[in-house]
């Protein structure tokens, strides 16, 4: 019985070691280390942290004006820290909406082609490692870094807000903030995936970066203009029936929902 017990323990340890030493997780750990130690990531996290602290300061100075007696959302006081703004600086939500895509693009535009240009990709593929394993590991590593950073920033805003206003968030407010951060991670993951796709498609990192930024600019700036032109051209007349007006509004709303920022 003792020998059987020892054998079972050794098998479990062997399985645990195989999981730790799996090529996928080895690449993930290596990519996380590269991201955290890179100047690019430090500059990005510095910019995003400063802008988030600026939006928090704006929200704290205007939280009294943001609360209105006839506002049904006035009971969610803690959530105003993430949405309140006086117009000088955008709110925390708008900052994530604007800077989140840049974060995903910055961590993914050279994920594959940089390895190819340095000659390390062929060395990795010469090992018994599948091509998809490398791509997925790079995506998971960048997503882990993004998730940790967004959760840290979100809880920092919550902590400073708690110290400033002295009112703790309710359970509903807390879970709303957590779900918002999770949604933000999915939003940034879309742009990270897009950047990795362009990194696979183009050999030069500059080309993949420009392609990713071009798609981001199109949906952030030009797509809204195009939808407004379409809405103006298809605008129903004053004699239109309520059914036609509702169909028109649903069509325009469907067009706007094609933009990732609008869905976010």
What are these language model-derived features?
Residues 52-61, 76-96, 137-196, 200-203:
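Secretory targeting signals
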Residues 105-127, 139:
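Transmembrane helix boundary and interhelical loop/hinge segments in multi-pass membrane proteins
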Residues 17-49:
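Aromatic- and glycine-rich beta-strand/loop motifs that create alpha-glucan
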Residues 59-83, 221-264:
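Terminal transmembrane helical anchor/hairpin motif
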């Amino acid at each position: 019985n003792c020998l059987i017990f020892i054998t079972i323990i050794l098998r479990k340890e062997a399985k645990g070691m195989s999981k730790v030493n799996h090529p996928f997780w080895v690449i993930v750990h290596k990519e996380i280390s590269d991201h955290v130690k890179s100047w690019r990531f430090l500059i990005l996290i510095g910019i995003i942290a400063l802008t988030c602290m600026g939006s928090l300061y704006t929200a704290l100075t205007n939280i009294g004006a943001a609360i209105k007696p006839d506002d049904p959302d006035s009971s969610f006081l803690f959530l105003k820290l993430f949405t309140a703004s006086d117009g000088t600086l955008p709110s925390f939500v708008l900052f994530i909406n604007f800077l989140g895509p840049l974060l995903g693009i910055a961590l993914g535009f050279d994920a594959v082609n940089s390895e190819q240009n340095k000659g390390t990709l062929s060395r990795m593929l010469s090992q018994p490692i599948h091509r998809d394993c490398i791509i997925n590991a790079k995506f998971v590593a960048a997503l882990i870094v993004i998730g940790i950073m967004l959760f840290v920033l979100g809880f920092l805003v919550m902590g400073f807000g708690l110290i400033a206003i002295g009112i703790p968030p309710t359970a509903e407010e807390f879970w709303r903030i957590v779900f918002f951060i999770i949604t933000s991670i999915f939003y940034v993951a879309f742009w990270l995936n897009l950047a990795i796709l362009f990194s696979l498609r183009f050999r030069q990192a500059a080309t993949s970066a420009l392609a990713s930024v071009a798609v981001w600019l199109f949906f952030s700036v030009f797509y809204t203009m195009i939808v407004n032109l379409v809405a103006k051209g298809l605008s129903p007349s004053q004699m239109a029936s309520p059914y036609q007006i509702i169909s028109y509004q649903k069509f325009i709303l469907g067009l706007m929902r094609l933009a990732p920022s609008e869905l976010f």
